[in-house]
């Protein structure tokens, strides 16, 4: 930080910069509190979502194993090919205290039996159940993915905000306080010297009676 002029205007400038830096630190702390509150809500949601995903995947795997045993892998593979599809995803961005956080949305993924590319009668009950459970798992996964992206972005922003707060409180503000003290001390010393010179001048040049 460059030194300010050792003048009263310089002192006023440094004090103004210190006030701005202090206000900035307070605003950043308020921002961090809001982001942290949002983050903790998301942590709870993500943990719940992961538990739901574990359950959904467990059901899907069990259903697939049963379908393989009852209908055979080759038959399931032949049904899976026409059932394949691209899933259109919509990514939107919302802002929390100016922080862009992505959100992923998709249309309903669980399909009726006649929407999987084959005649419904081609699907046995176990194969249809396996397909449905996997589609349900994908829906849960996409929901969690959106929250995980949001969580990661908030975490990054909280870290960056903390670094900025630390820089202001540990570097900028102490430096400005020190600079203000230096200028104030120099001005006081200058005032004392001026007062001494004035007394000497008056002593040498007394006013005529």
From Swiss-Prot:
Superkingdom field: Bacteria
Protein's GO biological process: proton motive force-driven plasma membrane ATP synthesis
Assigned keywords, A-Z: ATP synthesis, Hydrogen ion transport, Ion transport, Transport
GO terms assigned for molecular function: ATP binding; proton-transporting ATP synthase activity, rotational mechanism; proton-transporting ATPase activity, rotational mechanism
Entries under PANTHER family matching the protein: V-TYPE ATP SYNTHASE SUBUNIT D
Family to which this protein belongs: Belongs to the V-ATPase D subunit family.
Its biological purpose: Produces ATP from ADP in the presence of a proton gradient across the membrane.
Protein name as catalogued: V-type ATP synthase subunit D
Organism: Anaeromyxobacter sp. (strain K)
């Amino acid at each position: 930080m460059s030194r300010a002029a050792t003048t009263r205007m310089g002192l006023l400038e440094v004090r103004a910069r210190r006030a701005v830096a202090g206000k900035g630190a307070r605003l950043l702390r308020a921002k961090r509190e809001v982001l942290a509150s949002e983050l903790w809500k998301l942590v709870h949601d993500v943990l719940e979502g992961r538990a739901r995903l574990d359950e959904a995947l467990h059901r899907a795997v069990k259903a697939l194993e049963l379908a393989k045993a009852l209908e055979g892998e080759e038959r399931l593979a032949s049904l899976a090919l026409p059932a394949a599809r691209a899933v259109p995803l919509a990514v939107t961005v919302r802002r929390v205290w100016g922080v862009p956080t992505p959100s992923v949305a998709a249309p309903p993924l669980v399909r009726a039996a006649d929407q999987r590319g084959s005649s419904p009668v081609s699907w046995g009950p176990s194969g249809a159940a396996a397909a449905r459970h996997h589609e349900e798992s994908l829906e849960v996964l996409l929901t969690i993915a959106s929250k995980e992206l949001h969580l990661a972005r908030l975490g990054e922003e909280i870290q960056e905000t903390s670094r900025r707060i630390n820089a202001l409180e540990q570097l900028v503000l102490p430096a400005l306080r020190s600079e203000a003290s230096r200028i104030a001390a120099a001005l006081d010393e200058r005032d004392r010297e001026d007062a001494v010179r004035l007394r000497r001048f008056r002593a040498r040049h007394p006013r005529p009676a």
